[in-house]
Amino acid sequence: AQSSDEDVVTAEYIGNDATPDTASFHIAVKQLATEQINQGNYLQPDRYQFTPGIYSFDLNTNTNSYEFQFSVDRKDSNADVQQKLMQLINHSKIGLNASMDQNGKGENALVLSSSQTGIADDEDYLFQILPDASPSSMLALKLLGINQIAQEAGNSSFGLNGKDHSSYSYSFMV
């Protein structure tokens, strides 16, 4: 199996026969599958906008629900709080990657992206973040803004021998 443009599509024969069928396929990639990305608010790193205390929020996927708790000390700056959350999410190993984005003003935003790409027709999101019912957790989540979806998950879209197809990921079998 071979591709005429390995930068766009790779082909691999995985059949049982040592000589693959001689049929050829024409694939036209229209759109790659995308992950969900939530981007938080940009905060000034050296400000202290979080009141000391213990906060929590729920992170829901289509199959599981997780509760995250974090504490804020009086010496924790905005950057410290964002860093704590980034490490908390990355160490949880639940299929999300947390990173920090910095704008031209030097402000930081927490960015969460799903490892999974694509989404089923009956799903609205790959993950959703909701605050604890306490007013302080609601305020902290509003300040962080990590519940805001910046990019929805999307399926790949491609034509195979003139017929439209889609897939949750970058790979499929014919």
Question: What does each model-found stretch correspond to?
Answer:
Residues 1-107, 113-174:
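Bacterial flagellar/type III secretion structural subunits and associated motility module proteins
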